[in-house]
């Protein structure tokens, strides 16, 4: 292409971008924000290395509701507890759409629970919640699975006693096995190739999506499709994960008994058979594969990442670790594993777990939302179809809700009588209509794993506690703890 042709192409792109920008502005009364450039939008004001920090700084200048342009696309950004709560909870239906997230959408194509929308999302979510409840989510039966998996983890950790190790893979295998048992019908041995492959794909993709490459792809997907980089590996991983799930689905089809479903896949296949004559049915192979992927991804990475944050925090603050262990010894003792019934008798431990989730803020910007209709909001009119970013980080670090938000402080979740105190600004699983459907399972896992490990081990860092850096490595999709090793000593 010669220079003249290139110039003409760039001019056309600029005109198209400007027309899209101004047409989108004209559809409603959008909140203020930094002035966008043609094609680039607000790219110059948004550091791809740390989009969260950039948006948080802009909120201080433009207020709790403002507009940024990701390329030519306007996106509303909400910050602070009151604003986010008003959108996700008070106006839950209007803000219940799923916003554009090309990193995922180019794989899921709008199928599955996490990235579907409208009636399809409502039907899939209702079905998935019911099936997960039938298989014990939030009940004693799933607690027994967690206790069993926790005991396997403790066996592995005892073999590591006194030896430095990286906890990433050990935790991921154990946590993933719980959701695998619900989805596939049975747990895997820790050296099973299928489990190891699942963990590799999920861990690697979470890192990429939480990196600048992931952020840039979400802004300029059509451009980065032509550029080499880690995002290419991300889609290869997605494809490998899809193939693995499809293989398991075929195995289920060969042995399916509709009258005796063994797991989530069996239930979905049975529903597909029941609605196979309905051309409008949302139960098909694509939605099964993507829904299964969503469950595995969500049920593996966030809990494992939160536990790693907890390890770092407890090693940096050994007095907190010792106080938790004292409460465990007093309430549970050493002769049995902690159970969920113990939680109400362990207010300090419960407060520490909640404070870990608040402070670590694993999903700081939430998944994007979208307004489902023209929506009046705080003096503005947000047009139907506009994407919305809710900065959960600004909720968890809201000084009006937490006394010392920049510090790790379990007192945030304790009242004057040292009883556990809930906070309405606690939103690690989001809030409203799009609340993570795996929240009950994740909360159970966190409590049982956290208490079981501290009942049996003391965590020791390889460096001086004062030198432990709690600043997350990434602030994209997820806040990842910095890589570390530790020693566990049997108590």
UniProtKB/Swiss-Prot annotation:
It is a peripheral membrane protein. Club cells in lung and liver. Coiled coil: none annotated. GO terms for molecular function: heme binding; iron ion binding; oxidoreductase activity, acting on paired donors, with incorporation or reduction of molecular oxygen, reduced flavin or flavoprotein as one donor, and incorporation of one atom of oxygen; oxygen binding. Pfam families: p450 (PF00067). GO terms for biological process: naphthalene catabolic process; response to toxic substance; trichloroethylene metabolic process. GO terms for cellular component: endoplasmic reticulum membrane. Its EC number is 1.14.14.-. Involved in the regio- and stereoselective transformation of naphthalene to trans-1R-hydroxy-2R-glutathionyl-1,2-dihydronaphthalene in the presence of glutathione and glutathione S-transferases. It specifically catalyzes the production of a very reactive and potentially toxic intermediate, the 2R,2S arene oxide, that is associated with necrosis of the unciliated bronchiolar epithelial cells or club cells in lung. This is Cytochrome P450 2F2. The lineage of its organism: Eukaryota, Metazoa, Chordata, Craniata, Vertebrata.
């Amino acid at each position: 292409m010669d220079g003249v042709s290139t110039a003409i192409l760039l001019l056309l792109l600029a005109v198209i971008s400007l027309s899209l920008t101004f047409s989108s502005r004209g559809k409603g009364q959008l909140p203020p924000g930094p002035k966008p450039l043609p094609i680039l939008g607000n790219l110059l004001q948004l550091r791809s290395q740390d989009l969260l920090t950039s948006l948080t700084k802009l909120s201080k200048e433009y207020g709790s509701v403002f507009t940024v342009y990701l390329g030519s696309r306007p996106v509303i950004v909400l910050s602070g507890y009151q604003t986010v709560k008003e959108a996700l909870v008070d106006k839950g239906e209007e803000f219940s759409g799923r916003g554009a997230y090309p990193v995922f959408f180019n794989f899921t194509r709008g199928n599955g629970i996490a990235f579907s929308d409208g009636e399809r999302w409502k039907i899939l979510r209702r079905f998935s919640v019911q099936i997960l409840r039938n298989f014990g989510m939030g009940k004693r039966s799933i607690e027994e699975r967690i206790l069993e998996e926790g005991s396997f983890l403790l066996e592995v950790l005892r073999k590591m006693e006194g030896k430095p190790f990286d906890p990433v893979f050990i935790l991921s295998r154990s946590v993933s096995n719980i959701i695998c048992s619900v989805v596939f019908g049975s747990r895997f041995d820790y050296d099973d190739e299928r489990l190891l492959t699942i963990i590799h794909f999920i861990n690697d993709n979470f890192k990429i999506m939480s990196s600048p490459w992931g952020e840039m792809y979400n802004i300029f997907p059509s451009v980065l499709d032509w550029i080499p980089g880690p995002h290419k590996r991300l889609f290869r991983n997605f494809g490998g994960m899809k193939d693995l799930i499809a293989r398991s689905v075929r195995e289920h089809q060969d042995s399916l008994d509709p009258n005796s479903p063994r797991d989530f896949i069996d239930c979905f296949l049975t529903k597909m058979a029941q609605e196979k004559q309905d051309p409008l049915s949302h139960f098909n192979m694509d939605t099964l594969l993507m829904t299964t992927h969503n469950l595995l991804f969500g049920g593996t990475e966030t809990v494992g990442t939160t536990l790693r944050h907890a390890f770092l925090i407890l090693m940096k603050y050994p007095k907190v670790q010792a106080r938790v262990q004292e409460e465990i010894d007093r309430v549970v003792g050493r002769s049995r594993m902690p159970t969920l019934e113990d939680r109400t008798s362990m207010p300090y431990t419960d407060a520490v777990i909640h404070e870990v989730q608040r402070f670590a803020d694993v999903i700081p910007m939430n998944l994007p939302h979208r307004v489902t209709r023209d929506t009046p909001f705080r003096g503005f009119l947000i047009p139907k179809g506009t994407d919305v970013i809710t900065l959960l980080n600004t909720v968890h670090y809201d000084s009006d809700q937490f006394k010392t938000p920049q510090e790790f402080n379990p007192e945030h979740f304790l009242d004057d009588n040292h009883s556990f105190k809930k906070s309405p600004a606690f939103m690690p699983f989001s809030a409203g209509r799009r609340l993570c459907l795996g929240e009950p399972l994740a909360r159970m896992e966190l409590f049982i794993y956290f208490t079981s490990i501290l009942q049996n081990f003391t965590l020791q860092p390889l460096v001086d506690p004062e030198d432990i850096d709690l600043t997350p490595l990434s602030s994209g999709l997820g806040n990842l703890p910095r890589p570390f090793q530790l020693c566990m000593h049997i108590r």
